[in-house]
UniProtKB/Swiss-Prot annotation:
Subunit (UniProt): Oligomerizes as a right-handed, spiral filament on DNA at oriC.
Job description of the protein: Plays an essential role in the initiation and regulation of chromosomal replication. ATP-DnaA binds to the origin of replication (oriC) to initiate formation of the DNA replication initiation complex once per cell cycle. Binds the DnaA box (a 9 base pair repeat at the origin) and separates the double-stranded (ds)DNA. Forms a right-handed helical filament on oriC DNA; dsDNA binds to the exterior of the filament while single-stranded (ss)DNA is stabiized in the filament's interior.
Domain topic, free-text comment: Domain I is involved in oligomerization and binding regulators, domain II is flexibile and of varying length in different bacteria, domain III forms the AAA+ region, while domain IV binds dsDNA.
Residue span of region Domain I, interacts with DnaA modulators: 1-86
Organism: Salmonella choleraesuis (strain SC-B67)
GO biological process, one term: DNA replication initiation
SUPFAM superfamilies cross-referenced by the UniProt entry: P-loop containing nucleoside triphosphate hydrolases, TrpR-like
Keyword Cytoplasm among UniProt keywords: yes
Protein name: Chromosomal replication initiator protein DnaA
């Protein structure tokens, strides 16, 4: 019996689990087999508890399959083992459209510096942290749409410079990417108060570089950015077509990774889809972990509204929160803005917050949403997206090239409009409500199983809500 047993388990787990789950939870594990005991080492307690809770039965089942009565006992521990005694899971890209994987060059961290065991006291130059102390993991509302992103960010905060470096978060505007950046920064500094953590928008990096060139201070610029312990850059897509900035960031990126210094980047799109950015940079963006943040589902939208109201000492009836969440679906920022308007109107008028009051306070916003998202608009958008005719969506054709877009359009109609299932079915060629319900459940299932369907749904939501 040897560590090849764990390799067999890894191969099977990679086949059985979604790519995101495998990369996030199984990949960081290290294994040691001795005395008929397989010890699995997790980088921190968070990963250990999650793996033991979610995947213990899977792993034990595989051990029994491969070894039968001779299956080793399983033991979990927090920590790492020497390289000669460990076996790490190979790196795989996650949450990515189907694509050809670019091999990642081997990176060997310098032995002299871990970057995190001994963080020095602040020294010149003075670092501008810019981390907003108000954005923490505690006040980030978690749901299915952002669960993986939050979990990855939490792990980076607990173990910066580790397995998820760089961490790349992508998704539409107002979905919580910036909140998570600040939460990681706050988490790192809570753990290491003297850590040099710098948050910035990508345009600030460009501005700093331009000033450095103008003032003949490019070496100081390089020293500043290459000596931080964690660099958190928002909206990296603004590097597009800025060749000199991309060149400098390329070398900064390499220097930070070689020093085991953490990099977190955000964008409104998947790395490979960022136009105007060099391929060598886009390739590096995907070296660590890439995770999507999607528009919040109904339950999460309600939870966001209730939490925001609670923070403002406002009693928000559940039916009112549901009413708002059902009608405003695109992003968190829009939800919070609408609630702020409701609260302000209630304070000015002294009236109770009811559904009728909300209808009045948000009448222009609600009217705009209802005007923008109609079943006709959904059918037109879906037909264009899948390059079929609207008539195909209404027809009786059952080929997958038509049936799947039809199901997608029905699911979007249920998500984005207030029409009943029978009304939606009637708009799709006179189908009954059970057909619509089946379509909605099918798309929900496929969003869990297929990255392509998940991406299609998110792209269409963004298009229809913009």
């Amino acid at each position: 019996m040897s560590l090849s047993l764990w390799q067999q388990c890894l191969a099977r787990l990679q086949d059985e689990l979604p790519a995101t789950e495998f990369s996030m939870w199984i990949r960081p594990l290290q294994a040691e087999l001795s005395d008929n005991t397989l010890a699995l080492y997790a980088p921190n307690r968070f990963v250990l508890d999650w793996v033991r809770d979610k995947y213990l039965n899977n792993i034990n089942g595989l051990l029994n399959t491969f070894c039968g009565a001779d299956a080793p006992q399983l033991r979990f521990e927090v920590g790492t083992k020497p390289v000669t005694q460990t076996l790490k899971t190979p790196v795989h890209n996650v949450v990515a459209p189907t694509q050809t994987t670019t091999a990642q060059p081997q990176r060997v961290a310098p032995a002299a510096r871990s970057g995190w065991d001994n963080v020095p006291a602040p020294a010149e130059p003075t670092y501008r942290s810019n981390v907003n102390v108000k954005h923490t993991f505690d006040n980030f509302v978690e749901g299915k749409s952002n669960q993986l992103a939050r979990a990855a960010a939490r792990q980076v905060a607990d173990n910066p410079g580790g397995a998820y470096n760089p961490l790349f978060l992508y998704g539409g505007t107002g979905l919580g990417k910036t909140h998570l950046l600040h939460a990681v920064g706050n988490g790192i500094m809570a753990r290491k108060p003297n850590a040099k953590v710098v948050y910035m928008h990508s345009e600030r990096f460009v501005q700093d570089m331009v000033k450095a060139l103008q003032n003949n201070a490019i070496e100081e610029f390089k020293r500043y950015y290459r000596s931080v312990d964690a660099l958190l850059i928002d909206d990296i897509q603004f590097f597009a077509n800025k060749e000199r900035s991309q060149e400098e960031f390329f070398h900064t990126f390499n220097a930070l990774l070689e020093g085991n210094q953490q990099i977190i980047l955000t964008s409104d799109r998947y790395p490979k889809e960022i136009n105007g950015v060099e391929d060598r940079l886009k390739s590096r963006f995907g070296w660590g972990l890439t995770v999507a943040i999607e528009p919040p589902e109904l339950e999460t939208r309600v939870a966001i509204l209730m939490k925001k109201a609670d923070e403002n000492d406002i009693r928000l009836p559940g039916e009112v929160a549901f009413f708002i969440a059902k009608r405003l679906r695109s992003n968190v920022r829009e939800l919070e803005g609408a609630l702020n308007r409701v609260i302000a109107n209630a304070n000015f008028t002294g009236r109770a917050i009811t559904i009728d009051f909300v209808r009045e306070a948000l009448r222009d916003l609600l009217a705009l949403q209802e005007k923008l998202v109609t079943i006709d608009n959904i059918q037109k958008t879906v037909a264009e997206y899948y390059k079929i005719k609207i008539a195909d969506l209404l027809s009786k054709r059952r080929s997958r090239s038509v049936a799947r877009p039809r199901q997608m359009a029905m699911a979007l109609a249920k998500e984005l409009t207030n029409y009943s299932l029978p009304e939606i079915g009637d708009a799709f060629g006179g189908r009954d409500h059970t057909t619509v319900l089946h379509a909605c459940r099918k798309i929900e299932q496929l969003r869990e199983e297929s990255h392509d369907i998940k991406e299609d749904f998110s792209n269409l939501i963004r298009t229809l809500s913009s």
